[in-house]
Amino acid sequence: MKVLLALMFFPRGGSAQVMRYLAKNLRDNGWEPTIVAGSAPGEADATKFFDGLDVRPIDYSDALEADDPLRADPPMHPSFEDREDAPDRVFAKVDDETYEHLVAAWEEHLREAGAADADIIHLNHLTPMNEAAERACPDVPRVGHLHGTELLMLNEIAEGPPGGWDHAGEWADRMRRWAQSCERLLVLSPDAVRRVPDLLDVDPGKVVWAPNGFDPQIFDRRPKTGDERVKLWREWLVDEPRGWRPDDQDQGSVSYHEEDLAAFADDNPVLLYVGRYTEVKRIPLLIRAYARARDRFETRAPLVILGGYPGEWEGEHPLEVIQATGVEDVFLPGWRSHDDLADGLNAADVVVLPSVREQFGQVLVEGMACGLPPIAVDAHGPATIIEDGEDGWLVPADDEEAMADALIQAVNDADERRRRGDNAYESSRARYSWPALAKEVASVYDDVKAGKPESETAPGPLPDIT
């Protein structure tokens, strides 16, 4: 049986990682995957990102150079985030004419990718691809996959759209209609299972909990210590820096010197954040909490902020916060391939995610799979992943002092850090390994293909996270 996995965005976030690992494991469960996805130069090249898979890239190179990237041929995707001067403006600012242009383009992309011959179309996010699939191949059943950013935009619209979101109402209506037309909706957390039916006005029976996971062959305990650890951070910070300044967005405009690597000597504990520079991630809060905690550390413990797609940020840039606080030992190595992430995690000791609206928390389970205890916010996805006090730390949202206290305990109590890391390793492997998760997604496809009622695919009892 054939499934077409469709992703409008070029690969830079969690949804692309999900598609890559899911596709790699679907063949073992009777489904042959094809991926159609946006593509951009460099790290966002879909052909390279989905290497080894049947991928049909939609090249956005020309669109990125156009006066209006969304009116190019082919057009670039819009965004669920409203970032000033970004080429992909927020969906809620996209007018009807541009919307129709996007739909028409994706009708063609889906046809060329073989959508009409697929048994299932797996649509990531709620985008004009959904409308295109309905128009181009209405008889092929659709499975939707919500990754969280679309829900955040819908929440903003419901609370009162920001200025300039002149088409917010139309987009909210479209997204609800697209969700309702899917046979099933995969969501990342029990919290989303509870919230999505009301938010999108869909039958609760079609909403299925499908957490993200990790590849156990890639993410495992292979700790880098001593010279090997320093060597990796030398490569990422000194020899091949990719950090960038808000006023100079070329990769490498933030770099470091050999003497800066003293922070990583003597197997000092390393605190690692991984992700984009978006406002909900609360990187400025993390840096300020670290500045508050650092004087109470019993040993040097550098904070590494890994990520930040070049030129993309919301609110304060991390470098601006570092300069404003004057804090030392905070490092910005920039954006690196997901293929490098396991090495980075194994050269660290704690993974930290201060995000206040994280629908899942992909990097948490990847870090846990490498034996790192996580520190995260007690809300949404992280609250279902982490057992506070056993395999990590959970802190209240937007609580700088609580975040600082968790950092201090993680740094100063090595025995407790290792105990929680051991537990994190075991719990991640028991719950979030991709081979097992892909089997569950394949069973959803099987049910949809067989025409089973929604209630037969609905999740069982969900954990109580209130």
List each model region and its residues:
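Aromatic "clamp/platform" in nucleotide-sugar-dependent glycosyltransferases that forms part
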Residues: 356
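Carbohydrate-associated surface elements
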Residues: 191, 213
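A conserved catalytic-core segment of Leloir-type glycosyltransferases
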Residues: 34-116
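Short hydrophobic beta-strand element within catalytic cores of glycosyltransferases
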Residues: 373-376
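Conserved acidic donor-binding segment of nucleotide-sugar-dependent glycosyltransferases
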Residues: 388-389, 393-400, 409-414
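Nucleotide-activated donor-binding/catalytic signature segment of Leloir-type glycosyltransferases, i.e.
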Residues: 307, 315-339
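Conserved donor-binding/catalytic core segment of Leloir-type glycosyltransferases
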Residues: 4, 186, 227-281, 287-290, ...
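Membrane-proximal helix-turn-helix segments that form the acceptor-binding/catalytic region
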Residues: 164-185
